[in-house]
Amino acid sequence: MSEKKINLLDLDRKGLRALFTEMGEKPFRADQLMKWIYHFGETDFDAMNNINKVLRAKLSARCEVVAPEISSYQKSADGTIKFAINVGQGQEVETVYIPEEDRATLCVSSQVGCALECTFCSTAQQGFNRNLTVSEIIGQVWRVANFIGFQKETGERPITNVVMMGMGEPLLNLANVIPAMDIMLDDFGFSLSKRRVTVSTSGVVPALDKLGDALDVALAVSIHAPNDELRDVLVPVNKKYPLEEFLAGIRRYIAKSNANRGRVTVEYVMLDHINDSTDQAHELAKLMKDTPCKINLIPFNPYPGSPYGRSSNSRIDRFSKVLMEYGLTVIVRKTRGDDIDAACGQLAGDIRDRTKRLAKKRMQDSQISVTIN
């Protein structure tokens, strides 16, 4: 049996330099190789003409550059593109490209499904299978960057920002998310500014501390409720890491970070008559008073079977005004890609659920239906 080849997309620059040293080559070859892969989208070692033939032969024998394939894509009326990415064994994750006037953001997945069970999120209802590898995470960026590059006649902009806000909880896959983000930031990788790479978390506090020690990127935190009682229902990880503990972890991260410019983004999905009252706005403002932040109010994007509805514009407006009375910076997120189920909370993919969460839900729904009938 032939030895399995090393997928170079699994290695950041430190890993590539170690590989070249082990091969008896100069470490700077890693810089050359990364430039070919990430700046030019090249996968054929023979095309890398500033690398000598002997080394190219060594690389061909031992290594490969393999990104997960794009299975299909849909384009929204607003220009948003949702990609289905094949990660093997009949499973897909979803990646979303969001073009704007001054930037183009790619929303990247970190897990096949999600290990958390946020009750307002479509991904969470699909259950969980596994963590994505480094090559499967950075491969989403690589594939879409090449797709956009080959589709220049359509006018899509190159990727300027990456947000780890797709399927999964990034901080439950730090071992692979950190090297992938290293490649995004590396001058020989995608060369993105640390302020243009954002990781989002629902509150896995010990992992947030580890991230702060390893990397400096922008942070977005999923709060979604102004108190523990409601957050225990909406974001069940809160039962393990309640708000006070989460906010303390956020402040520790801010203290270490330059990328956040002294504050984080608070994500708050607006659920009709669940978390959107003026009293809850006052409660949220008081909760966040000691944590430097800007608050991103996200109109809920319904999905089939969702138990929640979207807050009305008037309720969102009232909620926003209360927060601003406390001197908080508030942004109401513009919904993008909802006509192709690419908006926040709508990503589902194709998952073999190891948790059996979706099957249990279907069983419960069928039992309810039988009872009603």
UniProtKB/Swiss-Prot annotation:
Catalytic residues, per the record, are 94, 344
Membrane-spanning residues: none
Domain Radical SAM core: from-to ranges: 100-339
Binding-site positions, [4Fe-4S] cluster: 114, 118, 121
Annotated compartments: Cytoplasm
- Which InterPro entries does this one have? Aldolase_TIM, Methyltransferase_A, RlmN_N, RNA_MTrfase_RlmN, rRNA_lsu_MTrfase_RlmN/Cfr, rSAM
- Does the entry feature the keyword Signal, yes or no? no
Q: Which BP terms in the Gene Ontology apply to this protein?
A: rRNA base methylation; tRNA methylation
Q: Name one GO cellular component term.
A: cytoplasm
Q: Provide the residue positions that the database annotates as binding S-adenosyl-L-methionine.
A: 168-169, 200, 222-224, 301
> What does the record say about how the cofactor binds?
Binds 1 [4Fe-4S] cluster. The cluster is coordinated with 3 cysteines and an exchangeable S-adenosyl-L-methionine.
Disulfide bond residue pairs: 107-344
Catalytic activity annotation: adenosine(2503) in 23S rRNA + 2 reduced [2Fe-2S]-[ferredoxin] + 2 S-adenosyl-L-methionine = 2-methyladenosine(2503) in 23S rRNA + 5'-deoxyadenosine + L-methionine + 2 oxidized [2Fe-2S]-[ferredoxin] + S-adenosyl-L-homocysteine; adenosine(37) in tRNA + 2 reduced [2Fe-2S]-[ferredoxin] + 2 S-adenosyl-L-methionine = 2-methyladenosine(37) in tRNA + 5'-deoxyadenosine + L-methionine + 2 oxidized [2Fe-2S]-[ferredoxin] + S-adenosyl-L-homocysteine
Q: Does the keyword rRNA processing apply?
A: yes
Q: Which cofactor does it need?
A: [4Fe-4S] cluster
Q: Which UniProt keywords apply?
A: 4Fe-4S, Cytoplasm, Disulfide bond, Iron, Iron-sulfur, Metal-binding, Methyltransferase, rRNA processing, S-adenosyl-L-methionine, Transferase, tRNA processing
The EC number(s) attached to this protein equal 2.1.1.192
Summary of the function given for this chain in its UniProt record: Specifically methylates position 2 of adenine 2503 in 23S rRNA and position 2 of adenine 37 in tRNAs. m2A2503 modification seems to play a crucial role in the proofreading step occurring at the peptidyl transferase center and thus would serve to optimize ribosomal fidelity.
Q: Which PANTHER family match?
A: 23S RRNA METHYLTRANSFERASE (PTHR30544), RADICAL SAM CORE DOMAIN-CONTAINING PROTEIN (PTHR30544:SF5)
Query: In the UniProt entry for this protein, what further remark is given in the free-text comments?
Result: Reaction proceeds by a ping-pong mechanism involving intermediate methylation of a conserved cysteine residue.
Give the similarity note: Belongs to the radical SAM superfamily. RlmN family.
Protein name in UniProt:
Dual-specificity RNA methyltransferase RlmN
Q: Which organism is it from?
A: Shewanella sediminis (strain HAW-EB3)
